[in-house]
Amino acid sequence: MIKAQQISKYQNGCEKILQIPGIRFAALINNKGRIISGGLSEKITPYEKDEEKRNVLFMEIALDLTMRKEFTNTLGSIHAIVSYRDKVNIITIPHRENFILLSVEPELDSQRIINLVRELL
């Protein structure tokens, strides 16, 4: 369970990440797919306007990350997962028992963004 002080720290971190041009969404999400802190950039219009569908996506990503962790002993830890789509890149970064989820413009350098996020959080 994350304490209120930690949530505030992560919220501030997500807000800093959202200031980076091209970042559409930045949030800390728990292993059940629920947003702990962060959210959509106020500068963009979301491609998926249905909040329920977005929540289903978060749950699917949480499940996918959990399933991929089964190979940690043989392949090593997951540092990040990047899904390259036509309109956005989705970046998942494991963070303790939770994960950071980012939606970024496709022209951004995903590895650079991952490194910046690790520095901020």
Name these PLM-found stretches:
Residues 1-121:
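Non-catalytic interaction/Regulatory regions outside core domains
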